[in-house]
Amino acid sequence: RRPPRSTPLYSSAASDVYKRQPQVNIHGFSPPELHHFTKMNSLSIEEVLGRLKTAGLGSIPGGGAEILVDRVREGMTRGKVDTENWLNTMRVWHRMGGRSSATMMYGHIETLEERIEHMERIRQLQDETGGFTAFISWTFQPDNTPLADIQPLGAYEYLKVQAISRLYLDNVDNIQSSWVTQGLKVGQLALLYGANDMGSLMIEENVVAEAGTVHFLTLDQIRDSISELGYSPRQR
C-alpha cells in the first residue's frame, strides 16, 4: 500500500538522504507538488518549504510551469497551481536562499505572444530574486494525450525558441538543452542556438515517456556531443 504523500513523509526522506550523503544536492518537489503538500497538511507554502529546507532540500525543479498564463493553464493544467502561486513558490524559496530552475512547455494551445509573456514573468522574477540557475524549454509531446490531434513542433521551431530564450533571458546564466524530448542530435544543435547546458543524466523519466518520447544518454555521450562541436565539457 502506497503511503500518504505528506510533508512529514518527504521531509523524513530528504533528511535521511542528506544525513547519509551530505555532499549530494537534493533537487526535488516542483511547485504543483509543493502546493499539494500545503493542502494535505494545512500548511502555508512558507512552512512547507521551511521544513523541507531544514530537512536538507537543496534546490527545486521548475516543473509544472508549462505556460505561465492563466488562460492557457485553465485549458492545459486545470487543477494544478495557477500562475501567481507558481511564481510565488519560487519567490519564497529564493528568499530562503534556495535555488531552482525554470521551465516552459510550448506548442499546444498557447499563442506566440503568450510564450513571450511566460518568459517575461520568469525574467521579472529573476530580476527580483536572482534565484533561477537555468531555463529549460521543450515542445509539447501530444501522443497519448487528450490533445493528440495537435501537430507536434519540429526541430526548427524548437531551436528558434532556444535562441529567443537566450536573448530574452539574459539574466539567467544557463539555458539548458532538452535532449530528453528532442533527442541527441537536436539537443546537440541547441548548443549552437543559445544553450550552454546539456542537463544531467536521468535514471528514470515518466512524464514525456507516457507520450511515447524516450531518450536516455550516458555521461560519455553527453561529453562527446559537447566536444564534437569544439566546446569543452564542464560539470557545474
Description of each model-found segment:
Residues 27-37, 68-70, 77-78, 89-114, ...:
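Conserved strand-turn element in the central/C-terminal portion of the radical SAM core barrel
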Residues 25-29, 49-68, 96, 129-140, ...:
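Non-cysteine beta-strand/loop elements that form the S-adenosyl-L-methionine
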Residues 20-21, 126-236:
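Auxiliary Fe-S-binding modules of radical SAM enzymes
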Residues 44-48, 109-123, 182-193:
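Catalytic cores of alpha/beta
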